[in-house]
Swiss-Prot record:
Region of interest called Disordered, as start-end residue ranges on this chain: 1-115
Full protein name: Polyadenylate-binding protein 2
Its biological purpose: Involved in the 3'-end formation of mRNA precursors (pre-mRNA) by the addition of a poly(A) tail of 200-250 nt to the upstream cleavage product. Stimulates poly(A) polymerase (PAPOLA) conferring processivity on the poly(A) tail elongation reaction and also controls the poly(A) tail length. Increases the affinity of poly(A) polymerase for RNA. Is also present at various stages of mRNA metabolism including nucleocytoplasmic trafficking and nonsense-mediated decay (NMD) of mRNA.
Stretches for region Interaction with PAPOLA: 286-306
The species this protein was found in: Homo sapiens
Assembly notes: May interact with SETX. Monomer and homooligomer. Binds RNA as a monomer and oligomerizes when bound to poly(A). Interacts with PAPOLA, but only in presence of oligo(A) RNA. Interacts with transportin. Identified in a IGF2BP1-dependent mRNP granule complex containing untranslated mRNAs. Association in a ternary complex with CPSF4 and influenza A virus NS1 blocks pre-mRNAs processing, thereby preventing nuclear export of host cell mRNAs. Associates in a single complex with SKIP and MYOD1 and interacts with SKIP in differentiated myocytes. Interacts with NUDT21/CPSF5.
Extra remark: The association of the expanded polyalanine mutations together with the capability to oligomerize may induce intranuclear inclusions and cell death. Expanded polyalanine mutations may either result from unequal crossing over during germ cell homologous recombination or from DNA slippage. The pathogenic mechanisms mediated by polyalanine expansion mutations may be either a general disruption of cellular RNA metabolism due to the trapping by the inclusions of PABPN1, mRNAs and/or nuclear proteins, resulting in the induction of cell death; or may change the normal muscle cell differentiation.
SMART domains: RRM
Domain notes: The RRM domain is essential for specific adenine bases recognition in the poly(A) tail but not sufficient for poly(A) binding.
UniProt GO molecular function: poly(A) binding; RNA binding; RNA polymerase binding
Gene Ontology terms describing biological process: cellular response to lipopolysaccharide; MAPK cascade; mRNA processing; muscle contraction; poly(A)+ mRNA export from nucleus; positive regulation of polynucleotide adenylyltransferase activity; RNA processing
Biased amino acid composition, Pro residues: 77-87
Length: 306
């Protein structure tokens, strides 16, 4: 009995302690609906006291609750390269620094504000130069077209004549042989001036050396002048006795070696005279035309002095 009383007293003392946050109080409904606290001699109180004493170490072990670990923030999706960045109020770590860095470059009044106008000025100058180059090309093309369409007077190209026209011109022309190498077209025109109106004087020259060959052709305005000029055959011109005969029309396949020399390669200095007796010198404007048959002693060619 003494042991039971001591246990009840211990249970009452334990029940009389201050109720801490880590202690439990077991209520067992009694006859009056509630069990009395620390009532000595009660069986229910005794059982509760033993249970409290037995559970007290477990409660002390479970009393410190571990702090909840902070939840890891899920990785934020990266924005595509062209998408705008987060705003100033997003609160994302590092966003403010990323926004501040370009802000420093944009707000820098040193280089950025000076380079933009200079760059624009350079681009404008390049555009102007390109436009000027295009205009120059257009002008050059127009000038070339005009030159091709209308050659300048006094330097007209060789006129292509039909066979009938060539025969008619040859009928009004004479051949002058043994002409002095230093003679000019003006001197020949003056020598035959009394025979009639002279349209053209052609002095043939060597193709390679450019030296005169010693004969010429003179074209008159009419056939009557040709007959008159034959009277100057074997006359003296610059100390030489010249030979004057009517010019013959040469055709392909007809030999022209009766005058003692091949006539396949030559240059011609031609001077034209119009009806008002004014004259101009066209230079070496004739091209040799002919066929040379190799392996034979004679050459056959078609010769056109005009």
């Amino acid at each position: 009995m003494a042991a039971a009383a001591a246990a009840a007293a211990a249970a009452g003392a334990a029940g009389g302690r201050g109720s801490g946050p880590g202690r439990r109080r077991h209520l067992v409904p009694g006859a009056g609906g509630e069990a009395g606290e620390g009532a000595p001699g009660g069986a229910g109180d005794y059982g509760n006291g033993l249970e409290s004493e037995e559970l007290e170490p477990e409660e002390l072990l479970l009393e410190p609750e571990p702090e909840p670990e902070p939840e890891e923030e899920p990785p934020r999706p990266r924005a595509p390269p062209g998408a705008p960045g987060p705003g100033p109020g997003s609160g994302a770590p590092g966003s403010q620094e990323e926004e501040e860095e370009p802000g420093l470059v944009e707000g820098d009044p040193g280089d950025g504000a000076i380079e933009d106008p200079e760059l624009e000025a350079i681009k404008a100058r390049v555009r102007e130069m390109e436009e000027e180059a295009e205009k120059l090309k257009e002008l050059q093309n127009e000038v070339e077209k005009q030159m091709n369409m209308s050659p300048p007077p006094g330097n007209a190209g060789p006129v292509i004549m039909s066979i009938e026209e060539k025969m008619e011109a040859d009928a009004r022309s004479i051949y002058v042989g043994n002409v002095d190498y230093g003679a000019t077209a003006e001197e020949l025109e003056a020598h035959f001036h009394g025979c009639g109106s002279v349209n053209r004087v052609t002095i043939l020259c060597d193709k390679f050396s450019g030296h005169p060959k010693g004969f010429a052709y003179i074209e008159f305005s009419d056939k009557e002048s040709v007959r008159t000029s034959l009277a100057l055959d074997e006359s003296l011109f610059r100390g030489r006795q010249i030979k004057v005969i009517p010019k013959r029309t040469n055709r392909p396949g007809i030999s022209t070696t009766d005058r003692g020399f091949p006539r396949a390669r030559y240059r011609a200095r031609t001077t034209n005279y119009n009806s008002s007796r004014s004259r101009f010198y066209s230079g070496f404007n004739s091209r040799p035309r002919g066929r040379v048959y190799r392996g034979r002693a004679r050459a056959t060619s078609w010769y056109s002095p005009y």
